[in-house]
A protein has these predicted regions:
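N-terminal secretory signal peptides
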Residues: 1-10, 17-21, 25, 30-33
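C-terminal segment of N-terminal export signals and the immediately downstream linker at the start
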Residues: 26-56, 69
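Boundary regions of SH3-family modules and the immediately adjacent low-complexity/disordered segments
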Residues: 20, 28, 89-125, 172-204
Length: 267
């Protein structure tokens, strides 16, 4: 990447002029944003096709079911997805190609149990593609909902079921007002240092997040300094991001991104 920097003022001027995409490409941000995929991908919808080329016009070889996990071999460019000009990324998998927009990049990282859970709970993160919750701390207990890779949940205590030699984390869902149990090997306890405030020395009034709907880019500033620029997906019609100026006054881990209490697709 070229060692260039934009000030907050320059960035807003360029964004308003409609040349942001060109400038970011010149600065090398287009290449920087093309991070390599994870080693695995989880199918997010049922009936996702496998093609013999990275094109929706190519031959369909297979249909994947929801939550199927496949190994990702490479990232390639192909047809834009479903009329979205911002995403032309496809994944090469065994036997063909799949469109990236239908897959969640995931890893499978099993964890050792940690028994030290404070009275107020501790935040944990799902470290496998998908984990079923249970209504009790038993392998054969009735299943609850599914939790997906990268989602975070409050662990309230550790439960050891001696007769089946299993270890569980009890999590509490503040939307459903209910406790569930997750195998301890499927959750990573998040260290305190990962939850500390970013740049606490910078006043809140000097922090700005700029969402550019035209280029689908999110850029963060601390005063006049640009500290992050990354792609975003601002939503399609009906769930799109509204225009305007907004103040974020409350952010909290493990909050449902819905007002309907739907914990099924809790990503």
């Amino acid at each position: 990447m070229k060692n260039l920097q934009l000030s907050r003022r320059d960035f807003l001027k360029i964004s308003a002029s409609g040349t942001l995409a060109f400038v970011l490409a010149e600065m090398g941000f287009d290449r920087a944003l093309a991070a390599p995929p994870a080693s695995q991908g989880r199918v997010t919808w049922s009936g996702i096709p496998l093609y013999d080329a990275p094109s929706f016009q190519a031959n369909q070889l297979h249909l994947f079911g929801i939550d199927k996990v496949v190994s990702l071999k490479a990232e390639v460019q192909g047809d834009e997805g479903y009329g979205n000009p911002f995403n032309k990324t496809w994944y090469e998998v065994d036997g063909g190609y799949v469109f990236s927009g239908d897959f969640q990049p995931v890893e499978t990282n099993y964890q050792k149990p940690i028994y030290d859970i404070p009275a107020g709970g501790r935040l944990g993160e799902i470290s496998v593609p998908m984990s079923l919750t249970h209504l009790g701390p038993y392998t054969y207990a009735k299943n609850g909902h599914r939790l997906y890779y990268g989602s975070t949940h409050w662990i309230m205590k550790v439960v050891i079921t001696r007769d089946e030699k299993s270890i569980w984390y009890e999590i509490f869902d503040d939307e459903l007002k209910k406790s569930f149990y997750v195998p301890s090997y499927n959750m990573r306890l998040i260290p305190t240092e990962e939850l500390t405030m970013l740049s606490p020395e910078v006043p809140a009034a000097d922090k700005l997040i700029h969402v550019d709907l035209a280029t689908q880019m999110v850029t963060a500033f601390e005063g006049q300094k640009m500290v992050l620029s990354t792609r975003c997906s601002s939503g399609q019609r009906g769930t799109d991001t509204p225009k305007g100026e907004f103040t974020t006054f409350h952010k909290w881990p493990s909050r449902h991104m819905t007002n309907q209490g739907d914990a099924v697709q809790n990503v």
